[in-house]
């Protein structure tokens, strides 16, 4: 209430008239901390204790303005005990907030938002799992016993290899490199072809050993040609007997 209203209210009544002096007396039952008792009424000489002093008892020094002003004494409710001035014990109020987490008290909305965000992320991860990255070592490896595809040679490559085989059934490393480069093959492919060709020659001539020199090979070819007419005559004789 403004000071003008208070002054006009008190000017209508004199000391001791119609209103008892005890009506405005309000004192604390206990004097805690050696603080003076707050008394309102005509006996106090028109002065009373500033509310900032009462606030200092609970919250320490006040940063509010301490300019003197007058206040209606009826606006202040006195219950006898300064500890119950606000209706509850300040010590209990402090212990109530001290028992909780200060972060939850100050940032309750943030905590709840963060918790809800984490819950949504967990649900999203369960519904749509992220694709796993496949590393080279995680891919299925080829079977150890798997055979490679059979190499096919063109007519030109086969003709050139046959010529080289008739000239020399065994190739040196240098000659093998030259043949492989000329035919567009690898050294391993040329080597395997010559091995297979020698095995084929042994089966055709019924020999356990392939001739190591060219002279031996020529002699074997001559013997084969000599045996050819004899084999033809024997075949004709067998056909005549059957008839």
Swiss-Prot record:
Would the keyword Nucleus be found if you checked this record's keyword annotation? Answer: yes
Q: Name one GO cellular component term.
A: nucleoplasm
Annotated region (Disordered), positions in chain: 203-243
Q: Residue ranges for motif Antp-type hexapeptide?
A: 134-139
Residue ranges of the DNA-binding region?
Answer: 146-205
Which GO terms are recorded in the biological process aspect for this UniProt protein?
Answer: adult locomotory behavior; anterior/posterior pattern specification; dorsal spinal cord development; embryonic skeletal system morphogenesis; grooming behavior; negative regulation of myeloid cell differentiation; regulation of transcription by RNA polymerase II; sensory perception of pain
User: What is the predominant subcellular site recorded for this chain?
Assistant: nucleus
Q: Which PROSITE patterns match?
A: ANTENNAPEDIA, HOMEOBOX_1, HOMEOBOX_2
The record's section on InterPro entries has:
Antp_homeobox_TF, HD, HD_metazoa, Homeobox_Antennapedia_CS, Homeobox_CS, Homeodomain-like_sf, HTH_motif
Subcellular localization is given as: Nucleus
Q: What would be an example GO MF term here?
A: sequence-specific double-stranded DNA binding
- Give UniProt keywords alphabetically: Developmental protein, DNA-binding, Homeobox, Nucleus, Transcription, Transcription regulation
Does the keyword section mention Transcription regulation?
yes
Name of a matching Pfam family? Homeodomain
Would you indicate the residue range of the signal peptide? none
Q: Which SUPFAM superfamilies match?
A: Homeodomain-like
Q: Which family does it belong to?
A: Belongs to the Antp homeobox family.
The subunit structure is: Forms a DNA-binding heterodimer with transcription factor PBX1.
| Task of the protein | Sequence-specific transcription factor which is part of a developmental regulatory system that provides cells with specific positional identities on the anterior-posterior axis.
User: What is the protein name given in its UniProt record?
Assistant: Homeobox protein Hox-B8
């Amino acid at each position: 209430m403004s000071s003008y209203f208070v002054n006009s209210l008190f000017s209508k009544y004199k000391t001791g008239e119609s209103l008892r002096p005890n009506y405005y007396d309000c004192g604390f039952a206990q004097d805690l901390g050696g603080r003076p008792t707050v008394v309102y009424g005509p006996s106090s000489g028109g002065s009373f204790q500033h509310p900032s002093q009462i606030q200092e008892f609970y919250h320490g020094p006040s940063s509010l303005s301490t300019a003197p002003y007058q206040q209606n004494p009826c606006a202040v409710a006195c219950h006898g005990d300064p500890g119950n001035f606000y209706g509850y014990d300040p010590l209990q109020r402090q212990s109530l907030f001290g028992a909780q987490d200060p972060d939850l008290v100050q940032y309750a909305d943030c905590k709840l938002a963060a918790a809800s965000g984490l819950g949504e992320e967990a649900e999203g991860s369960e519904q749509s799992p992220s694709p796993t990255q496949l590393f080279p070592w995680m891919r299925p490896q080829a079977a150890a016993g798997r055979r490679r595809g059979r190499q096919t040679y063109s007519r030109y490559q086969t003709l050139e290899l046959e010529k080289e085989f008739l000239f020399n059934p065994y190739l040196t490393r240098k000659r093998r490199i030259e043949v492989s480069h000329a035919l567009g093959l690898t050294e391993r492919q040329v080597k395997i072809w010559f091995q297979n060709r020698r095995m084929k020659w042994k089966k055709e001539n019924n020999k356990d050993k392939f001739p190591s020199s060219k002279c031996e090979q020529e002699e074997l070819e001559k013997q084969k040609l000599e045996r050819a007419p004899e084999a033809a005559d024997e075949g004709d004789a067998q056909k005549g007997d059957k008839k």
